[in-house]
Amino acid sequence: MKKSIILAIGNELVEGIIIDTNSKYISKKLLEIGYKTVAINTLPDDLEILVEEIRDSLKKADLLITTGGLGPTEDDLTREAISKTVGKELIFNEKLYNSILKKVKEFHSEIPKNIEKQAWVINGARIIENPVGTAPGQILQIGEKQIIILPGPPVEMKPIFEESLKFLEKFEKIYQKRIKTLGIPEAILVEKYKDIIYKYKDVNVATLASHISGVELRFTGKKEKVDEIVKLLKEKLSDHIYALDNETIEEVVFKKLEGKSVSFAESCTGGLISAKFVSIPGISKVFKGAIVAYSNKVKEKVLNVNKNTIQKYGAVSKECVMEMAKEVSYFLDTDYAVAVSGIAGPTGGTKEKPVGTVWICAYKRENDYYLVEKFFFRGNREIIREKSALNAFNLLRRILS
């Protein structure tokens, strides 16, 4: 696989004023045509540093891509740095200059004196005009190496980068699958299933742990090998794997319902589960509605939860969520239901039931089947609510399976 390096250039990036979103986009696109990005470096507008990094990158990679530093000001130094590094002079392109002037005149009555800087290009470079702004892109061949020079603003970078891909040699397309898991820590997941995860040395494995959405495993390599690993993990981790690739858990649940209906009884999530579900187009085919039973009185009066249940076990209990789930399924006449009750904090916790204690129940009306679990979530109020919603969908997914 060919190697690529991306250099994101600009003081505003180094100082954290602007977040670099370009590199993620570029790296993903390059992987699709057979280039593996081995480094992404953020650099200041400093000529010496730029020259050193460009020289070092060309030793390590087949393709170098730079973003930023192509403006008309004195601190825009990418052109100069590349010119100095590869030993090719900057030349003035009259045709490009006239094109830039035409664009500037459309929006400004006065022409900035320094705008001509953007018409200086590296000798021998292929010019890719900017359809949005004024700084053009450039493609340079240095022996067997290639350099793609792109502007920094994403709205300008993307169309120029897409055009530049036409001039890159296409290699074997790389195949990638992503597995999203819940309820199993990264360390345990990797240790317990390492023989499957690392079955093939030529399949690249990346793990990404999130404090809300669990652990994601990414496998990159030949299709047949990646698919085999995914198949084996799905067999072992059916309770934990909730989605693949770009799927959300809400979309997975929607597909699994297959015309069956569902309702929610929400307490600590306060309607969050419903809000996430209705973001899916066509969800009215399966979702009948929800009851936000935040107070005990609403649980008793609307959901018909037995008052003795709450007095004996509390609203945050297995017994309470089981009644909530069953009652909402009958009240709204649905095949399935999910109920959630917990303590989101920051107050309200006790020694027996600390902040973060959440009970979730998924209910199947056909055979009066309950799937109930107790969770202890860490984090602030919003994180606890998010985790509760995600795990509520996962319990529903499991009961549907």
Curated annotation (Swiss-Prot):
Pfam family, one: MoCF_biosynth
SUPFAM superfamilies, sorted: CinA-like, Molybdenum cofactor biosynthesis proteins
InterPro entries: CinA (IPR050101), CinA-like_C (IPR036653), CinA_C (IPR008136), CinA_KH (IPR041424), Competence-induced_CinA (IPR008135), MoaB/Mog-like_dom_sf (IPR036425), MoaB/Mog_dom (IPR001453)
Domain of life: Bacteria
Family: Belongs to the CinA family.
Name of protein: CinA-like protein
